[in-house]
A protein has these predicted regions:
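Short, membrane-interfacial amphipathic segments enriched in basic
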Residues: 1-2, 78
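Hydrophobic alpha-helical transmembrane signal-anchor segments
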Residues: 3-40, 48
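Short, structured coil segments at secondary-structure junctions
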Residues: 46, 148-149, 179, 257-258, ...
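Charged, glycine-interspersed solvent-exposed loop segments at helix/strand-loop junctions
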Residues: 173-271, 420-502, 506-516
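C-terminal long alpha-helix characteristic of the crotonase
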Residues: 228-229, 260-302, 413, 423, ...
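Intrinsic disorder and flexible/low-complexity segments
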Residues: 300-343, 456, 527-583
Length: 583
């Protein structure tokens, strides 16, 4: 019997050791596979190469690299704005690259991001090289971007979907009533409409006014850009949209001056070969290949480029079901590190955020203020830098925005939920102090409790006004007149004193160099992207769950995200009253 147990024990240990060994071998093989998939060999372009930019996917400032996406074979593509701009710049300077081919697709991009790419393409054309665009169809944002091309081609059965801008707000009040959930709301700002979806069944007059104002301003910029590039009147562009001519066929788009010719894709390829003098096969280069040619040159003082993209949330509130990037207190830590780094002479902080947690925004604001005492910091605003995003920005030496950036929204709110009696759920409480169960969702709030929370919200708003007034050299009264939670475009914000100048990331870098009195400098990009091992071990589960939800919900996933954000974002919020959908 003793020998039998020895045999069993030895066999068990052998199995455990064997499985452990096989697991380690399997893990190393997986790491090697992913590393091989993500490694990029050195790219050397041949003469007469054309940079091909596939406008298909979602544009993000600095998307986190996800090597696991290659294994999951995810269809959704995230396009790096940083990489696209770098590739266009390199293509203009490299004599081996003759032109750019814009391949229109299903592009999701904010209007400010599209402005940045459009400006880069216009600068590229000054090199004398060509830009050609083709689409089976052109979405509105994609056409705005491609309209800068020398020649625009459209599939004979295609459409230019230039119809105008709209804004849709989802209201959950009816759903809350059916579920027996009531909302306790505390806010400051006539235009702070973030709470309206949970209180009203349609837009308030103030919210409707601000939305109409900013979408009309952005539409005006789009129309002017298209008209200028296509050498047509703004009235003609408006006519195309107003009369629904997107549905009149490709020939109508040609007649109106929006498109040059109808062509199928092989004919466009042949046209490009004629431009480059290639008889048989055209050599194309991808964005990542051309961007890889931009290697740092020389040495010297450094300007740090730091990205702040996504919702502002406490670290512990990050949801595993949310695939979007977020801003946490980690950004404050990075600003401290940059302040103490003697090699860094200036900082450019790129903000693309609708805002979020007031407390986290205040912590980051503090470190912007502290860094400014040691070295200049310039803000570059992306598609949105509003509410908490603007809170962070207001302390900087200088703020640069695109004309279509959504910013401002200086206001705060907080939401508490209460389960209504009709659910049939009751509770009883024993407490030591009057406010020990403040925020209890099982009972109505007392007048005293409401007064306390409204006072806290108003205090946060006064703090917000004070931060902006100090940072922008204005009085709190002046800030209050343009605050009240109202959203402004970048061009409006310049007129109001909330932004210094209009421009893109490159202008912000140039301004930082000027403030630091640097003639020669290097750019040091500060990244928070996860390492391969972090991707493999830390986020696999949440990512799979999020992808399953996205696959199941489809386009409605964004509404789930909105409700999820409201759930995890406790406390006072400094956030845009809605999410920004791409053009």
């Amino acid at each position: 019997m003793k020998a039998f147990f020895k045999t069993i024990l030895a066999s068990t240990i052998g199995v455990i050791v064997g499985l452990t060994f096989m697991g380690i071998i399997g893990l190393l093989a997986l790491v090697g596979l992913v590393a091989g998939l993500t490694s990029t060999p050195t790219y050397v372009p041949s003469n007469n190469t054309v940079l091909r930019i596939d406008l298909n996917g979602t544009i993000a400032d600095n998307p986190a690299e996800d090597p696991l996406a290659l294994l999951w074979k995810e269809d959704e593509t995230t396009l790096s704005l940083k990489e696209i701009l770098k590739a266009i710049k390199v293509a203009g300077e490299d004599p081996r690259i003759n032109g750019i081919y814009l391949r229109a697709g299903n592009l999701d991009g904010g209007s400010a991001s599209l402005q940045s790419i459009r400006r880069a393409l216009e600068a590229f054309k000054e090199s004398g090289k060509f830009v050609v665009a083709y689409g089976d169809n052109y979405t509105q944002g994609c056409y705005y971007l491609c309209s800068v091309a020398d020649r625009l081609f459209l599939n004979p059965q295609g459409m230019v979907m230039l119809n105008g801008l709209s804004s849709q707000t989802m209201f959950f009040t009816g759903l809350m009533e059916k579920l027996g959930v009531e909302m306790e709301v505390f806010k400051v700002g006539s235009y702070k409409g973030a709470v309206e979806p949970f209180l009203l069944k349609k837009l308030s007059d103030e919210n409707r006014e601000q939305i109409q104002s900013y979408i009309s301003t952005i539409w005006g910029h789009l129309v002017e850009g298209i008209a200028s590039s296509r050498r047509m009147s703004t009235d003609a562009v408006e006519q195309f949209a107003n009369e629904g001519l997107a549905f009149a066929g490709a020939q109508k788009a040609i007649d109106m001056g929006l498109i040059d010719e109808q062509k199928y894709q092989p004919e466009v390829d042949r046209f490009i070969r004629e431009q480059t003098g290639q008889e048989n096969k055209q050599s194309y280069a991808s964005v990542s290949e051309v961007a890889s040619l931009d290697t740092p040159k020389g040495s010297g003082p450094k300007i740090a480029l730091l990205y702040a993209e996504g919702e502002i949330v406490p670290r512990q509130s990050v949801s595993g079901y949310d695939l979007s990037q977020v801003i946490t207190e980690r950004l404050a830590d990075q600003l401290i590190e940059l302040k103490e780094d003697k090699e860094i002479k200036a900082v450019v902080l790129r903000i693309n955020s609708p805002g979020g947690s007031f407390q986290v925004a205040d912590q980051i604001w503090r470190q912007v203020e502290e860094l400014k005492k040691e070295k200049p910091i310039v803000i570059s605003m992306g598609d949105a830098a509003a509410s908490g995003g603007y809170y962070i920005a207001c302390a900087a030496n200088r703020i640069i925005a695109e004309s279509n950036t959504l910013t401002g929204s200086i206001g705060v709110f907080s939401l508490l939920t209460r389960l209504a009696d009709k659910l049939g759920i009751g509770s009883d409480v024993v407490k030591t102090n009057p406010y020990a169960d403040l925020g209890n969702s099982m009972r109505p709030m007392s007048a005293d409790e409401r007064a306390l929370l409204q006072h806290q919200t108003e205090y946060a708003y006064r703090t917000f006004l004070s931060r902006c007034a100090d940072g922008r050299s204005m009085t709190t009264e002046q800030v209050d007149r343009v605050a009240q939670g109202r959203v402004w475009t970048g061009s409006q914000a310049v007129d109001l004193g909330l932004v210094d100048d209009l421009g893109g990331l490159q202008q912000a870098i140039s301004d930082a160099a000027e403030l630091a009195q640097l003639d020669h400098y290097q750019i040091k990009e500060i990244t928070t992207n996860k390492s391969l091992f972090e991707e493999l071990f830390a986020t696999t589960g949440p990512t799979i769950k999020a992808n399953l939800l996205r696959s199941f919900l489809g386009d409605d996933f964004i509404y789930y995200q909105t409700l999820q954000q409201m759930r995890v974002n406790s406390g006072i919020q400094a956030r845009l009253p809605y999410d920004i959908r791409p053009l």
